[in-house]
Structures are given as structure tokens and as C-alpha cells.
Swiss-Prot record:
Pfam families: DHBP_synthase, GTP_cyclohydro2
Function: Catalyzes the conversion of D-ribulose 5-phosphate to formate and 3,4-dihydroxy-2-butanone 4-phosphate.
Gene Ontology biological process: riboflavin biosynthetic process
Gene name per UniProt: ribBA
DHBP synthase: annotated segments: 1-204
HAMAP family hit by this protein: RibA (MF_00179), RibB (MF_00180), RibBA (MF_01283)
The name this protein goes by in its record: Riboflavin biosynthesis protein RibBA
Region named GTP cyclohydrolase II: 205-404
Active-site residue numbers: D332, R334
Cofactors, names only: Mg(2+); Mn(2+); Zn(2+)
UniProt source species: Bacteroides thetaiotaomicron (strain ATCC 29148 / DSM 2079 / JCM 5827 / CCUG 10774 / NCTC 10582 / VPI-5482 / E50)
Length: 404
């Protein structure tokens, strides 16, 4: 099959700055779809009409979390159970100068108002015909989605961080795939880029971690090396524990492990985190080379205080997923972008990933890392964590096995 040509990110940024559309595609393991994106301040009724005619999907308007708060745009639902956690807010229409809100001119006016610093909550009526979307603050380095790609493109182009996007559908109503997207881009003189390439571009342009000093680290599993890393955006400190040497094209064992004070330090039986960490280190010691990236992301990213609240809800009958959702969190709020950059700093590009979690694989692959094999880290359930592990298997898709 002929490889589909993608355009340079630099050329796409230049077009975006001029108010042209760009087509953005994501990973095959994610939505495997293309979106038509444009800067909010560059939208016109004619461009809205082009999107409705040629893309045919749902017209959405990505904006930043801070902008959502400024405009008092809450999440559309308190319990987001969509597959990819698409972060819709309540729908809106611009009030002044618009009629029903559904025409191309009304929709363009609403999107333009999102990029107008003078707009306030009173500028918009709710509900309406435009779907704003919360974009993660660190863009595609936090979440490899079209929403974040739109905001990143606006920022890279020096424009207001707001945009419009629409999924591209084929004439028969199915989602357009890469060959058709390339043909559409060529027909209309548009640039076609991938989120994968946008991530790689940002990682080359930006460093999100500061590397510390490397030291020896003797452990019960053998002699390792340790390097701390500080995340520049929030000061969080992470570490890489590794041994051996490798070539850039050599797949090595990698465990990306989120901190669990209760499991890793106290040996808690409520989870299997500590067991997975030690098993991973044993496997790396046996292999003679490999990396554990230890991320400071307690409680799947919600922190120790919130994790204890979730534990209390679990004691009252909820499972681990519903407890997070009840507290206003996603089921999993971890950021794999920082882990990906740490691995790149260590010269790791191909890996045999030590995980039971399919989301972790997708999260790392989105940042340009190649996973040649998933290596499960099986643990033995105990009476305190069996329900937790079953929830991870049944509701989060983890690869786990239980004795009948």
C-alpha cells in the first residue's frame, strides 16, 4: 500500500496563521479520523458553510480551560462516560446580532466571540448550536486529540487560543480515512498533518523536563542507575531507574509507573501497584537492561488527598471508576507526555512495554514511541484488591486473569 504523504508542520502553521483550514489526523488506535480545523478569529460564514458542506461532522469550538472558566461554561455532563472523554461544555449561541443561532453567519459570530477578549458569560445564550470543548492546558503533550491540536496550532501561529473543528465524513456517511483525506486536501489546497507529527514538532521545539544528576542506585533487585527529572510546567519531580545500555533502534523493557505511596511504600493490599513495580524491576534485572519511569502521579493523577476520598467512597460501595467520577475526576487523569519525553531523553524509541493497561500503550504511542510488544505484569489478587482488579479489567480494559 502506498504511503500517504503528510505535510510539514511549519507549512501548516503558516497556512493556519493566514486563516486557511488544516486537516489533522490522529492515531489509528485512537479515533483514526481527520478533522477540519481553523482558528476561531479567522472563521467566517463562508468558512462555516465550507465545513458543513465538505466535512459534515459536528461543529465544535476548542478553547482553553481558563477561557471556559472566564465564560462560565461548565462541562456538559458531570459524569463523562464517552469512550475518549470528549470534553464538551454546555452548548452556546451568541446573543447579540444573531437570530436562531443555526445559520452559518450566526455560528461564525458565536465562534468569533469565543476569541474576543471582551466577551463575558452574558455574551452567550445557553443552550445553543455551538459545542465548545475544554482543551488540556499542555495541548497535545497532555492529550493527543484534535481539540488540543487546534489550540496548539493557534498558539504556534501566534493567534488567540481558540478554534473551530469538524470531523470529516465520506459521502456515504462513514468516517473519511487517510487516502480520502489526502485527496480532499489536494483538491482544496489544504495542508494535511498528523497529531503524531505535531507532538514530535513540539517535543523538538520545547523541553518540558529538566534533567538532574545521574547516580548509582543499589536496590534489592540489583544495581540500577537513577536520574531525577523536574517537570517545568508544575515543578513535579519524576525519576528514571534504569540499567544497561542500548541502541536507539533496540527495543528494551520499559515500565511507566505512576507513584502509589500506599502500595509502593506501605505495601498496601488495596492495589497491586507495589507488586507491579517490583516485578518490573526483577524483569529488567533479569534482562540486563531496561527502564522504569516513575511518575509523580499519585492516584492515577488525582493526588493523595483525593485518592483517600476515593478510597472512602469505595468503602461505602463504589468501585474505583465511579469513585473518581463522583469526585469530579476522570477515571484516569495521568499524563504520559512527560514520561515520553523522559524516555526520549534516555534514548529510548522502541520498547517492550511492561503493562496491563491498553490506555498506557495508546498514550505512549501517541508521542512517537514504538511499542513492539506488550508484556503483562501479572499479580495474584488478594481479598482486599480483587474487586479493584476486576473493575480495572471490566471497566478499564486491563489485561488481567483470575482463577475461577
Amino acid at each position: 500500500m502506498e504511503e500517504i504523504k503528510m505535510d510539514r508542520i511549519e507549512d501548516a502553521i503558516a497556512d493556519f496563521k493566514e486563516g486557511k483550514f488544516v486537516i489533522v489526523v490522529d492515531d489509528e488506535d485512537r479515533e483514526n479520523e481527520g478533522d477540519l480545523i481553523i482558528a476561531a478569529e479567522k472563521i467566517t460564514p463562508e468558512k462555516v458553510n465550507f465545513m458543513l458542506k465538505h466535512a459534515r461532522g459536528v461543529l465544535c469550538a476548542p478553547i482553553t480551560v481558563s477561557r471556559c472558566k472566564e465564560l462560565d461554561l461548565p462541562h456538559q455532563v458531570s459524569d463523562n462516560t464517552s469512550v475518549l472523554g470528549t470534553p464538551f461544555t454546555v452548548t452556546i449561541d451568541k446573543l447579540e446580532g444573531c437570530s436562531t443561532g443555526v445559520s452559518a453567519s450566526d455560528r461564525a459570530a458565536t465562534i468569533q466571540a469565543l476569541a474576543d477578549p471582551a466577551s463575558t458569560p452574558a455574551t452567550f445564550g445557553r443552550p445553543g448550536h455551538i459545542n465548545p470543548l475544554y482543551a488540556q492546558e499542555k495541548g497535545v503533550l497532555r492529550r493527543a486529540g484534535h481539540t488540543e491540536a487546534t489550540i496548539d496550532m493557534a498558539r504556534l501561529a501566534g493567534l488567540y487560543p481558540a478554534g473551530a473543528l469538524m470531523e470529516i465524513m465520506s459521502d456515504d456517511g462513514t468516517m473519511a480515512r487517510l487516502p480520502e483525506l489526502r485527496a480532499m486536501a489536494d483538491e482544496h489546497g489544504l495542508k494535511l498533518i498528523s497529531i503524531h507529527d505535531l507532538i514530535a514538532y513540539r517535543l523538538k521545539q520545547e523541553s518540558i523536563v529538566e534533567k538532574g544528576v545521574e547516580v548509582n542506585m543499589p536496590t534489592e533487585h540489583g544495581m540500577f542507575r537513577l536520574i531525577p527529572f523536574r517537570q517545568k510546567s508544575n515543578g513535579l519531580e519524576h525519576m528514571a531507574i534504569f540499567k544497561g545500555t542500548w541502541n536507539e533502534d533496540e527495543p528494551i523493557l520499559v515500565r511507566v509507573h505512576s507513584s502509589c505511596a500506599t502500595g509502593d511504600i506501605l505495601g498496601s493490599h488495596r492495589c497491586d501497584c507495589g507488586e507491579q513495580l517490583h516485578k518490573a524491576m526483577e524483569m529488567i534485572e533479569k534482562e540486563g537492561k531496561g527502564v522504569v519511569v516513575y511518575l509523580n502521579q499519585e492516584g492515577r493523577g488525582i493526588g493523595l488527598m483525593e485518592k483517600m476520598k476515593a478510597y472512602k467512597l469505595q468503602e461505602d460501595g463504589m468501585d474505583t471508576v465511579d469513585a473518581n467520577l463522583c469526585l469530579g475526576h476522570l477515571a484516569d487523569e495521568r499524563d504520559y507526555g512527560v514520561g515520553a519525553q523522559i524516555l526520549r531523553e534516555l534514548g529510548v524509541h522502541k520498547m517492550k512495554l511492561l503493562t496491563n493497561n491498553p490506555v498506557k500503550r495508546v498514550g505512549l504511542e501517541a508521542y512517537g514511541l514504538e511499542i513492539v510488544e506488550n508484556v503483562p505484569v501479572e499479580t495474584v489478587p488478594n481479598p482486599y484488591n480483587e474487586r479493584y482488579l476486576r473493575t480495572k479489567k471490566e471497566r478499564m480494559g486491563h489485561t488481567l486473569h483470575f482463577n475461577k
